[in-house]
């Protein structure tokens, strides 16, 4: 399903092992994608967050930099694969403070660089 509205912010998609982490009270979770005003993460344990639930934690970027994040859960999805039945993906809109554009640009550059050998 596509939206007729263009995205306001660049969204970075993380694949493979190099991903930012979202550190919440319940533990550290893998970030799947990130923009200045939102993020999506993978949760493999714990209770499913309710839509509208508040989210507060620390985002640890691939560079090692950490940023406080606060937001609201806007979507909860289950992967289509039956073997991943306990896994959920959670999307959150960042409310108070977003991710600075300099961080998004730095992360995008890091994603485009080939890994060091």
Task: Annotate each predicted stretch with a short phrase.
Residues 10, 47-51, 63-65, 84-88:
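A generic structural micro-feature
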Residues 27, 41-42, 54-57, 76:
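Short structured motifs
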Residues 29, 69-76:
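Short beta-strand-centered aromatic/proline hotspots
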Residues 1-44, 48, 106-117:
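N-terminal helix initiation/capping motif
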Residues 32, 80-117:
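C-terminal output/interaction extensions
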Residues 9, 15, 38, 54-56, ...:
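Broad gene-expression machinery/nucleic-acid interaction feature
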Residues 16-22, 52-67:
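Short conserved beta-strand and strand-loop elements enriched in small hydrophobics
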Residues 33, 61, 73-75, 96:
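A residue-level detector for short acidic-glycine micro-motifs
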């Amino acid at each position: 399903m596509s939206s007729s509205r263009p995205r306001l912010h660049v969204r970075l998609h993380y694949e493979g092992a190099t991903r930012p982490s979202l550190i919440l009270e319940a533990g550290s979770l893998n970030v799947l994608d990130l923009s200045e005003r939102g993020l999506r993460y993978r949760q493999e344990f714990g209770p499913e967050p309710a839509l509208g639930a508040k989210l507060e934690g620390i985002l640890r970027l691939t560079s090692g930099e950490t940023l406080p994040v606060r937001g609201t859960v806007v979507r909860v999805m289950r992967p289509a694969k039956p073997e991943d039945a306990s896994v959920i993906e959670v999307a959150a809109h960042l409310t108070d403070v977003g991710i600075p554009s300099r961080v998004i640009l730095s992360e995008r550059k890091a994603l485009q660089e080939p890994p060091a050998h």
